[in-house]
């Protein structure tokens, strides 16, 4: 008698039935997106995910893992070179940075446990293009509101991502490069600017689009959640996890930390569980970025966190003052060096307000180091209270017992 083959089925195998039974608002589209990604995998494409750890890229990652787990468990012949690129700008909101680090650690463990053909690529700006070297080093000014060119975005994110991608692909046979598909979490409803940008490049959630990059090479992209609303995204995340009442499997127990952070830093309220009658409820509109960003008049998400829960997020008040100073310094010519940086063909240098004066740069550096020191003192105080039992021994307090940021290090 032949032995009977059997397979232990879990939520990763049966999630589609779970979605149908749960009557999720986004259930049908979720299944459709996973099937599209699965088809890309079967076609031998190499999927690159641009992952920030925000709600949209988190959703795309979740959808991709559903497709990849299906392929691996089915024994399908797929590329071993799928990869995730994550950019650490080194000047991010510390809450976002710490949450991203914890997610990436959990994702790494999940990839190893399930033997997935997926690599995590984490990149940081080079020393010369870092915010610290450019601004505190006196090489340039912050990217203020209405600037024609977003120098900070180019240096900290775009160039860094391109360099990391090129470095990874250099390890792969060049003939396979044309099979790389960049999967993005951009959505039309984020803003008119984002919608126009997607349309400019012919972005689609139904098929791959290919455009020439800056070097004339074909670059293929895919926008799986292009038409999704904020409510759709929260519907997906609130139903994802490994817990008993989660419909969609995930590498995380749940996405409560992401939901709570957006709720605390935004102008809307997160909807944990939605039905067809609640999709129009307010959703989280918070945007998170670098704590030194002056592309807007204020870091609204950080300020909202501080005012919402000073006991929890008040440690960021100091670095938020740096953002306010930078924003208010834009038209204060007393803060500028009067000697330009560019020498003309005739050998002249313009005398006009240019980068920050060395005295201002010294003050900014002193402020950064001081807030780094104060953060270390705060963390040490929490650690001592944990040891003496003055505060509860829980995940949050253990996390707060180590510095949440250090923006000036010995390597800088």
Annotated model-derived regions:
Residues 54:
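Conserved G/P- and acidic residue-centered "switch" motifs that form tight phosphate/ATP-binding loops
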Residues 1-48, 57-412:
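Nucleotide-activated chemistry modules centered on ATP-dependent adenylation/adenylyltransferase
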Residues 51:
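The Walker A (P-loop) glycine that initiates the GxxxxGKT/S ATP-binding motif of P-loop NTPases
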């Amino acid at each position: 008698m032949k032995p009977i083959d059997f397979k232990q089925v879990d939520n990763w195998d049966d999630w589609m039935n779970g979605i149908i039974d749960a009557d999720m608002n986004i259930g049908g589209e979720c299944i459709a997106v996973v099937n599209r990604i699965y088809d890309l995998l079967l076609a031998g494409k190499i999927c690159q995910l641009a992952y920030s750890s925000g709600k949209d890229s988190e959703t795309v990652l979740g959808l991709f893992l559903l497709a990849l787990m299906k392929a691996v468990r089915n024994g399908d012949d797929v590329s071993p070179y799928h990869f995730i690129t994550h950019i650490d700008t080194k000047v991010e909101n510390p809450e976002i940075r710490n949450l991203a680090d914890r997610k990436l650690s959990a994702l790494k463990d999940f990839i190893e446990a399930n033997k997935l053909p997926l690599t995590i690529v984490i990149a940081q700006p080079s020393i010369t293009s870092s915010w610290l070297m450019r601004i505190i080093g006196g090489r340039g000014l912050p990217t203020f509101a209405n600037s024609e060119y977003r120098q900070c975005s180019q240096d900290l994110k775009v160039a860094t991502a391109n360099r990391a991608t090129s470095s990874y692909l250099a390890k792969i046979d060049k003939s396979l490069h044309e099979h790389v598909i960049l999967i993005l979490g951009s959505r039309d409803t984020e803003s008119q600017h984002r919608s126009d940008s997607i349309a400019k490049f012919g972005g689609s959630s139904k098929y791959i689009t290919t455009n020439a990059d800056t070097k004339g090479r074909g670059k293929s992209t895919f926008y799986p959640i292009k038409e999704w609303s904020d409510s759709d995204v929260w519907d997906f995340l609130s139903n994802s996890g490994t817990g008993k009442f989660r419909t969609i499997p995930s590498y995380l127990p749940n996405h409560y930390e992401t939901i709570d952070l957006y709720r605390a830093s935004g102008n809307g309220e997160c909807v944990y569980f939605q039905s067809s009658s609640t999709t129009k409820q307010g959703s989280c509109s918070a945007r998170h970025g670098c704590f030194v960003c002056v592309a807007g008049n204020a870091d609204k998400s950080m300020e909202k966190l501080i005012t919402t829960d000073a006991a929890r997020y008040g440690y960021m008040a100091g670095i938020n003052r740096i953002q306010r100073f930078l924003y208010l310094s834009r038209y204060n010519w007393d803060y500028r060096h009067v000697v330009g940086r560019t020498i003309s063909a005739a050998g002249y240098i313009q005398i006009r307000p240019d980068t920050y004066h060395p005295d201002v740069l010294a003050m900014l550096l002193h402020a950064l180091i001081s807030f780094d020191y104060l953060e270390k003192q705060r963390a040490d105080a929490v650690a001592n209270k944990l040891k003496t039992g003055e505060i509860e021994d829980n995940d949050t307090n253990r996390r707060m017992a180590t510095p949440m940021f250090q923006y000036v290090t010995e390597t800088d």
